[in-house]
Amino acid sequence: MDRNVTADGGHGRATALAACAAAGLALAVGLEVATYPRWRQWCLTWGATAEEATGPLPGDDLLAEPDILSTRAVRVDAPASSIWPWLVQMGPGRAGAYTYDWIENLFGLGMHSADQILPQYQGLKVGEAQRLGKRGPVLRVRILEPERSLVLRSDDGNWVWAFSLVPEAAGTRLISRNRIAVPDASPIARALNTYLMEPGSLIMERKMLLGIGQRAERLARSG
């Protein structure tokens, strides 16, 4: 009798906890769906000025009408010459992406962010390609203007990732723009892109931009 009561009680508690967890998740999803439209623009243009967010950048013509467009930026207290080496060595199996490696590697991307300049990856050329994971897209260098712009496009043409360096009086603006097309996405997939992938991309890209900036500033200080 006591054993059955204990078992029933444990089952009841587990059911109650599961119900609470489901209710909490539903509430969190509902809140995001309700509030995200109010801060979506901030999410997609974090750190960028109005001019940077709306102005033209190299690579825009490679995907004229994206479904998703983000432009994010940081100010770096270093010249473009101290930022550029970190950009050209980025990638899986290279210098990583300077973001949360453990999250990247959950998706099998093989990212290991370097804290030093790797000479073997400094000779990037137009046409070079790198695959993001075993089944991920292949990104190929399409535009390379040293210390000014680096633009990659996926071989399927649905993703353009552009980096621009804009000198200022005392530093450099580092701008990252993503143009993404999802032509065959279902309504559910588009909703997931909006409410899950966009905020997630901000978390990862913010870390990346700040990480590049910190490394560049350290390099500039070292002379």
Residue ranges and their predicted role:
Residues 56, 63-64, 75-82, 88-162, ...:
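Glycine-rich portal/gate segments that line the openings of hydrophobic small-molecule binding cavities
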